[in-house]
Amino acid sequence: MKTFVPKNNEQNWVVVDAAGVPLGRLATLVASRIRGKHRPDFTPNIIQGDFVVVVNAEKVVLTGNKLDGKVYTRYTGYQGGLKTETARQALAKHPERVIEHAVFGMLPKGRQGRALHSRLKVYAGTTHPHAAQKPQQLEVRTALEVK
C-alpha cells in the first residue's frame, strides 16, 4: 500500500471582512484557512492552505475590557528597552499588526509556520491590491456556524 500524498496545485484566495467581528473568532478562522484545516485532505506536513486577505482591520472588535487591559510588549534589545502599548493604542497606530499578532500566535512556531506567514495579507481599509487573484468573499459568521 502506498502512502497518499495530496497535491498542492490550487492557490485559493479568500477575502474576509473584519468589520464588527471579535478578534479571536476572526483569528481562529483565518489561522485555520491558512493552515488548510478546512480541507478534507488536510496533511499536517504539507502547506496546502488558502491565501487570506483581511480588510477593514481597524473595525475589528475587542470585547470586554481588552481595549485597555490587553497589553502588547516588545523588547528593543537595549537596557530598559521594554516597550508596551495597549490594544487601543495599537489599533489606532497600526491595526494590521493586531490581527497579524493574533493569527501568528495560532500558527506553528517552526519552519513551516514561518512559511505560512506570507499567506496572510491584512489591510486597514476596504481596498486591497489582490483583485487579480480573484479572491472569494468569506463571511465570518456563516463560516463559524458551519463548524
Swiss-Prot record:
InterPro entries: Ribosomal_uL13, Ribosomal_uL13_bac-type, Ribosomal_uL13_CS, Ribosomal_uL13_sf. Disulfide bonds: none annotated. SUPFAM superfamilies: Ribosomal protein L13 (SSF52161). This is Large ribosomal subunit protein uL13. GO terms for biological process: negative regulation of translation; translation. This protein is one of the early assembly proteins of the 50S ribosomal subunit, although it is not seen to bind rRNA by itself. It is important during the early stages of 50S assembly. One of its GO terms (cellular component) is cytosolic large ribosomal subunit. Pfam families: Ribosomal_L13. It comes from the Bacteria. One of its GO terms (molecular function) is mRNA binding. Part of the 50S ribosomal subunit. Keywords: Ribonucleoprotein, Ribosomal protein. PROSITE patterns: RIBOSOMAL_L13. The lineage of its organism: Bacteria, Thermotogati, Deinococcota, Deinococci, Deinococcales. The keyword Ribonucleoprotein applies. Belongs to the universal ribosomal protein uL13 family. The keyword Glycoprotein does not apply.
